Amino acid sequence: MHKVVLLRHGESLWNMENRFTGWTDVDLSPKGIEEARESGKTLKAEGYTFDCAFTSVLKRAIRTLWIVLDELDRMWIPVYKSWRLNERHYGALQGLNKAETAKKYGEEQVKIWRRSVDVRPPALEKDDPRYPGFDPRYADLSEEEIPLTENLIDTINRVIPYWESTIAPTIKSGKKVLIVAHGNSLRGLVKYLDNLSKQEIMELNIPTGIPLVYELDDDLKPIRHYYLADEEKVKEKKELVENQGKIQGNS
């Protein structure tokens, strides 16, 4: 049996402001730093240790990983960063307040943009300052690989090849792996691992800063999964994520 731990980064500054973030490189909020620290403490208390870690190229995930590894006294382990683990690209919605967007377009439309599998938000133009092609961290990507917007399927289509080519062989080799990523890149991975339907993935929320453990068989098929937190805390934090797209705003 293998175990892999998935962790959504701690609350970011734009999570705090209830804004669509996507590939925008915002940092952790003070609460997010504390969530990351608590994740590290929880993993340490439960006896978890890691041989290597995978994360995105966005600082909210990278910093969460740094803090967790610091708590575990494992800052020396290899860390592999890939744009393929980035958050879903929210196109022209990036930077907009979710509650204000819900007022303008309706809560149902915002829920579809945020949660559906195959609907893309309005796209960026290539001359928009937010276009990732202007960012040096994506200099090695082809124009076709750089998104102007993404739905969840698009996100899955970049996450899963990285899982299959790089992360899965690492797990199969016997290494203990930690993946620190984002709400939608992790939703995509969970959909793949658990073979979830469109409706099931639309209702799935992954809370910030709570380790999610997957126990996998030798073929990396899930045996079971669980959060390292009590059910009430998980429920409360999932509801926070769900309520971000509502007209009431932050809740």
Curated annotation (Swiss-Prot):
Annotated substrate binding sites: 8-15, 21-22, 60, 87-90, 98, 114-115, 183-184
Pathways per UniProt: Carbohydrate degradation; glycolysis; pyruvate from D-glyceraldehyde 3-phosphate: step 3/5
Site (Transition state stabilizer): H182
Pfam family, one: His_Phos_1
MF terms (GO), sorted A to Z: phosphoglycerate mutase activity
Keywords: Gluconeogenesis, Glycolysis, Isomerase
Active site: H9 (tele-phosphohistidine intermediate), E87 (proton donor/acceptor)
Top-level lineage group: Bacteria
Catalytic activity: (2R)-2-phosphoglycerate = (2R)-3-phosphoglycerate
EC numbers for this chain: 5.4.2.11
Gene Ontology biological-process entries: gluconeogenesis; glycolytic process
Annotated function: Catalyzes the interconversion of 2-phosphoglycerate and 3-phosphoglycerate.
Annotated family: Belongs to the phosphoglycerate mutase family. BPG-dependent PGAM subfamily.
NCBIfam families: pgm_1, PRK14115.1
Protein name: 2,3-bisphosphoglycerate-dependent phosphoglycerate mutase
Organism: Thermoanaerobacter pseudethanolicus (strain ATCC 33223 / 39E) (Clostridium thermohydrosulfuricum)
